[in-house]
Amino acid sequence: VMVSGILMPLSSNKLLILNPFCAPEDIDLEMMRYRPNSWMMIPMFVAFLVRNGRITDDYDMSYLLAAGVGCEACNNKEMKNYQKFLKDHNCNARFTTGYGCSEAGSNMTLPMMPYAMENGSVGVPLPVDIISIFKAGTHEELGYNQMGEICKYGQGNMLGYDDPESTAKALQMHEDGRVWLHTGDMGYMTEDGVLHVLTRGKSPRHGGGDLATLLMENIVADADIEGIKDEFFVIIPDEKYPGRFLPYLYVILEDGYTVEDIADQVYECLDPYMHPVDIFELPERPFFHFKTNRIGLK
């Protein structure tokens, strides 16, 4: 997000505003101060806009013509909530998501207007980039709509890490003679070339089934369970079965609701292998180092 946010305006004759001294929790005040036309954000920034309560209902955000996020995935409920927030404040920008990483030289995809921004959709590969899906841990290329590891070939890829072992794991020469970047992210690509990013790494559960955080979050989001404002999964190693994992669900509830009120509907909408071991309530989504603090909850 940072690299794109700097390169895009510099390469297109736009005014670039850099503010390294803004406290993240005051991002709403800075937005109202500078009134940006284009803003490449992270989900944490939008969450602060929504929940800080300092942007009044009648505040006009029509100056914002382009808005989107990177850094981490947004589930369907987050996407709907953020799009509604923009619309309620007279902003007609389409809220979008992108995908990239430092190792790939920043952005790897570009949102496309004809396609809905849901279910982990991050758009199509940027020009000159080649993105393909491979069976995790192999060089076997998969077909459309098959979930596997997202890999990228292109001139923007890094030269390597300081650690040769990590470099060899990330940059692999395939049988086609190309050096592919293995991102470690799992997803799939549709026949139209639209990439969907679903989770980080493979997380098989004992008894069968691979746990994908965004896929499970979207199922709960699409169930539209009354009382749930926001939710996210945390996947942790299964101490009883090495190499296997367990899911836990964290929810932010509307006033007056308890976990007991929503638990049955959560279990009903999910496949059995996706059932959370437990459901915990939080007052709000926690962030650390600009991302949802899943590590701190493990």
Please place each PLM-identified region on the residue numbering:
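General small-molecule cofactor/ligand-binding pocket signal
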Residues: 17-19, 96, 279-283
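Conserved beta-loop-beta connector loops within the AMP-binding
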Residues: 132-151, 188-192, 259
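Short Gly/Pro-enriched turn/cap motifs at secondary-structure boundaries
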Residues: 120-125, 177-178
